[in-house]
Amino acid sequence: MIKLRLKKYGKKREVSYRIVAINSASRRDGRPLEELGFYNPRTDETRLNVPAIVTRLKQGAQPTETVRSILEKAKVFEQVNG
């Protein structure tokens, strides 16, 4: 199963995340199928490749709870359903 989850990167205590499509059996920082965006929790900065995310969701990818809340803030699910 394909999951949309956060991949950790950055320096210690200055962590950022990439939003990636990855096989659910892979490690958190394993090789992703596709990088779909960026999230920095310190500044609350988010950059998303919305068309690619919508495509992955329509293919059946399941977002984790954290990624789901990021996508809800960006109103990505409205584009999937409508």
From Swiss-Prot:
Q: Name one GO cellular component term.
A: cytoplasm
For this protein, the record's Gene3D superfamilies field holds: 3.30.1320.10
Which Pfam families does the protein's record reference? Ribosomal_S16
Name the family the entry cites.
Belongs to the bacterial ribosomal protein bS16 family.
Q: Which organism is it from?
A: Crocosphaera subtropica (strain ATCC 51142 / BH68)
This protein's name: Small ribosomal subunit protein bS16
Molecular function GO labels: structural constituent of ribosome
Q: Which domain of life does the protein's organism represent?
A: Bacteria
